[in-house]
Amino acid sequence: MFKPSFVALALVSYATAQASAPQWGQCGGIGWTGPTACPSGWACQQLNAYYSQCLQGAAPAPARTTAAPPPPPATTAAPPPPTTSAPTGSSPVAGACGAIASTVPNYNNAKLPDPFTFANGTALRTKADWSCRRAEISALIQNYEAGTLPPKPPVVTASFSKSGNTGTLAITAGLSNSQTIKFSPTISYPSGTPPANGWPLIIAYEGGSIPIPAGVATLTYSNSDMAQQNSASSRGQGLFYQLYGSTHSASAMTAWVWGVSRIIDALEMTPTAQINTQRIGVTGCSRDGKGALMAGAFEERIALTIPQESGSGGDACWRLSKYEIDNGNQVQDAVEIVGENVWFSTNFNNYVQKLPTVPEDHHLLAAMVAPRAMISFENTDYLWLSPMSSFGCMTAAHTVWQGLGIADSHGFAQVGGHAHCAWPSSLTPQLNAFINRFLLDQSATTNVFTTNNQFGKVQWNAANWITWTTPTLT
């Protein structure tokens, strides 16, 4: 039998250390044991404590807390206004959705799927219809790309303690009293006397990157403890999988949503925490921005969703990102993402090469937030974020808020001039407007939908992708 020598082992170790990570690949982070070098012309940039990535350019971007230079002026580019149409066909009875489709056999559509038509071809007429369509979209996304989101488990208990302006929410969740997990997120409170209904709260994935205004509490959610995201080898690792098993279909992002829901359960059970559970927001940046969008889509108790620079796999659409790739923009797409990490279910691997057969896309994921509020922020300086895809995808999603008659509950702002996940001060007024209105219950103007139109080698043309006419849902 062959026995490797110490010299051979040393050579293997040396070769592993010298290997370069691929373009856009992971090159560092907590728990990372793979290559740390990048190809020529690419630099290993730390995006957060858990993840560094090979990005184009010779020098890494400054840390998130570094003050960013003012971005170039953004030009307003409003989405197409809704045009009223009279849908044909019967609608589900309000409150009774009937059978919910989780798959659509023989689907084939290279353009963006119509949010206003059920899988069976029936057109939406009413706001109650949207509730049913939203349930259908949820089932489709879980089946095709996210994995199954389990319901509230039989055991959920919580206790709360506070020292100064910092609180600790100790949560136990389990399938039985003998099969539980525990986690304890911390809450940073504003100074002063809380409002009568408690403080509004933002759940911040890994602490978040946005400036939180006065009067809003912040809960730091260590989502990577709930489901690890170090690399493609992280699948089935984390607290969620200790409870449901390492082979559960839920992706890491779906497991994070489950954790957010348990946090809100715990807050509802602990009035001493003095949190207004009717005024909860969620945020995160980059990979955690993808997760924040997923949480806002699936957890209906979230009042305001704020994904930041989530890009492909977040507020970008798979079909549009592929279009960018096909036309010379080096962006992340579905094929690259499923090989990079565990943010999506293994079932999605079956569809990344045949996206037209998928009866959903991320304009529908974002639309699941409606009629609740959402604003997403993107950065055109990083082409791999797929800026045209994000703008086009959110333009398509915006039609749902338009159809519901609440267009100013959905916003989008896209600028450059700052590092990835560094906050540009020029966007603070838009951010504060949404927080003031939807978390602080103050009057604010939230008609925000802007881009600087820096899309690399492509341009957005709504007529090429949006095939539906936006109805006025009654």
Swiss-Prot record:
Catalysis: reaction(s): a 4-O-methyl-alpha-D-glucuronosyl ester derivative + H2O = 4-O-methyl-alpha-D-glucuronate derivative + an alcohol + H(+)
The terms under GO molecular function for this entry are: carboxylic ester hydrolase activity; cellulose binding
Sorted UniProt keywords: Disulfide bond, Glycoprotein, Hydrolase, Lignin degradation, Secreted, Serine esterase, Signal
Matching InterPro entries: AB_hydrolase_fold, CBD_sf, Cellulose-bd_dom_fun, GCE-like_dom
Q: Where is this region: Disordered?
A: 61-91
Enzyme Commission identifier(s): 3.1.1.117
State the Pfam families in the record. Answer: CBM_1, GCE_fung
| Residues reported to bind substrate | K290, Q332, E340, W384
- Record-annotated disulphide pairs: C285-C421, C317-C393
Give the superkingdom in one word: Eukaryota
Q: How is it modified after translation?
A: N-glycosylated.
What Gene3D superfamilies does this protein map onto?
Answer: alpha/beta hydrolase
Q: Name one GO biological process term.
A: carbohydrate metabolic process
Catalytic residues (UniProt): S286 (nucleophile), H420 (proton donor/acceptor)
Q: What biological function has been recorded for the protein in this entry? A: Glucuronoyl esterase which may play a significant role in biomass degradation, as it is considered to disconnect hemicellulose from lignin through the hydrolysis of the ester bond between 4-O-methyl-D-glucuronic acid residues of glucuronoxylans and aromatic alcohols of lignin.
This chain belongs to the protein called 4-O-methyl-glucuronoyl methylesterase
Tell me what organism the protein belongs to: Cerrena unicolor
